[in-house]
């Protein structure tokens, strides 16, 4: 049974927010009020449906005392009683504490790991996979930085993805992605194993992370493309080093001013993510074992091209739909990861 007093508190809070927004809240408050209102709206809809189901059940049980209505009530009661546990479970999931970063845009970073040029090619495949997934969701996909490799792969890529639920859905992608396939350069037809690392970070605002000027060193350098060829004749590329943590961020677009903006944007996201991980570990020693822990060194997934198979090792999910997945069809994978994470958090909350 879900505590009714807690549900009523949520409804009252929602009604308060609705009244404030209708009355014309102060401009400085509108964004925060609107965000909270949007978060509570689906929860309040679940509460309304649950209360209606309880009322229908009570009405049917009362009908048992009426000889003329008893047969009808006996027909309806099994269905009505079966609905209550399902709706209570849906409510418990809706009431799970939300990750404050879920509504933010996502910063996506992809780097090849072991495997040389084949790893760089696979990193490029992953970048295209996420771009197609983002486009299918109607999200905005902005490539912030791209360093191509010799044979058309990538040495490093950074992108910003903005849209409803972008970080909430993509945050489970952080970790090591392993590929097993025959490289195009392999004359003997042997299967090679290589890997790429994916990091998905919530975008951070300046108000979230203050970076004193004394904490960073900014270096400029010559922009270069594939094979080390100079893209232009000015020192436009920017490398920013965060001295307290040693984090290094680079951006090599043609505009030095834009490169500074991009590098600071990515640096803020990384520092914000570090703080989020620190707080998560402080809240729960078991959090590392959950799907959304974001451990960058964890091998999370294998893409086996000869078998057309993708396996997510965290939840033992195997799908024989690799061409569709590489084309951006990640819906089933992300839904399974989300459900697993929700179940783990629900168990932790109720323990």
Curated annotation (Swiss-Prot):
Main location: cytoplasm
Post-translational modification: Methylated by PrmC. Methylation increases the termination efficiency of RF1.
Subcellular location: Cytoplasm
Keywords on record: Cytoplasm, Methylation, Protein biosynthesis
Domain of life: Bacteria
Record GO cellular component, one term: cytoplasm
Molecular function as annotated in GO: translation release factor activity, codon specific
Sites of N5-methylglutamine modification: 229
PANTHER family per the UniProt record, alphabetical: LD18447P (PTHR43804:SF7)
Function text: Peptide chain release factor 1 directs the termination of translation in response to the peptide chain termination codons UAG and UAA.
Listed NCBIfam families: prfA, PRK00591.1
The family this protein is said to belong to: Belongs to the prokaryotic/mitochondrial release factor family.
Protein name: Peptide chain release factor 1
Source organism (scientific name): Cereibacter sphaeroides (strain ATCC 17025 / ATH 2.4.3) (Rhodobacter sphaeroides)
Upper taxonomic lineage: Bacteria, Pseudomonadati, Pseudomonadota, Alphaproteobacteria, Rhodobacterales
Gene that produces this protein: prfA
